[in-house]
Amino acid sequence: MKVSLCSLILIAGSITAVRAETSEGDGIFAQFVTNKGTIEVVLEYEKAPKTVANFITLAEGTRNRIDPNTGRLTRAPLYNGQTFYSVVNEFGFFPLPSTFYALTGSGTSSSVGGPGYAVPDEFDASLRHNGYNVSMSALANFTGTLFGPEINRGPNTNGSQIMFTGNTILTRFDDVNSIFGSVTDPASRAVVDAIIFGGAGTTTISNVTIERVGQAALDFDEHAQNLPYVGPPLGELRVEENAVHFDHDEPLGSGSFFSFRRSSDLLSWSPTTRRHIDPDFGTEPSTQLDEIAAPKAFFDMLLTRHPGGLSPATLANRTLVLNTAPPNVITYTFVFDSTGTGGTTNYSVDASDGVITSLSYVAEGYGASLQITSSNIPTPLRARLGFDSEDASNLIGRHFLEGFNDPFWSPIGSGQLTLSK
């Protein structure tokens, strides 16, 4: 029996337009229409193609996402109706720079939400936060820090939230947030300033349109950038005497998450089971849904694919090394046992080895979240791990590390990581 899980999907027509040549030259432009005026953003589709493609498909509603308000699949344009829920307008005193930015695009007009998937970071040496930039900054699903809500959860956590910066240089966001556009014309910059100085919750986006000028812009295909997929799985339900399986048309590979729940009456549902495909174990052509074939059962299934994702399903028998960059240079080495929830710790500030006393690890699209306590480290730690590449022995990437100082989490540092295979 060939099945495709049916979900309510609102299909939005494309609002891409082609405009005549202008003095601004060729390019792809996003027009944000707000109650304070219109902002034109020049999109950096050649330097950040994946980030631009993700933004365009969310703005136009041409790709599936999860509505964070309902938990259902939708193709409704995400940014329509969104408010700038957080703004910062702090004037600096030498040598500290002023900080001007505004956040929007969570899908909830708050600090939680997102599209239901992650997109890897894209950085280019020529794209710096030197004023009036637009960048993708992942939502803070963690609790707030000592310094307020987090702007970015860490490496490879981009989703839908975007940050507009004002007339300021914010180097601390360079190679942290993925810049994908800039605001160049004076009228649009004035609108950005009005949003930032108007305060949180005072500006709403009514709609976003995408315009293209020139052949290169017309040729850019946002659907050919190997973006994540979220939606119904395709395959065949196979019922045996003592089990129920779902045979996938395309075997699940690294970076895939298959979630399902079961009901006998469509009223009460079992807890959701989430299967993550570990890169070390190849592909999964079939997923077992139930151990015993009941007389009647309904299954609600959702598939999320993150192409090229390297996150392992478990830390069992692996070694994780976190190095923090100056000025707070520390090396943490975690040697995990066969359970993946225990092991030993070496902490460069304290030469003695410690024992892991608690651990929580959640694999995500292009990284993972880790929370850990150890007998020789003075505070609980939590880290966002981003996996960028691999060699024969290790996964290689970046991390953002925090320590818990009751009642807040505060940054310790960021830097490079390796995780043994």
What function would you assign to each model-found segment?
Residues 4-14:
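Bacterial N-terminal signal peptides
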Residues 18-255, 265-267, 278-286, 292-295, ...:
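Cyclophilin-like peptidyl-prolyl cis-trans isomerases
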Residues 32-38, 325-329, 350-356, 376-380, ...:
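Glycine-centered tight beta-turn/hairpin loop motif at sheet-sheet or coil-to-beta transitions
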Residues 258-260, 299:
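Short beta-strand elements bearing conserved aromatic residues within extracellular beta-rich modules
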Residues 307-330, 397-402:
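Tryptophan-anchored aromatic micro-motifs
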Residues 323-367:
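N-terminal glycine/threonine-rich, aromatic-flanked beta-hairpin/loop signature
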Residues 373-421:
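Beta-sheet ligand-binding and adhesion/scaffold domains
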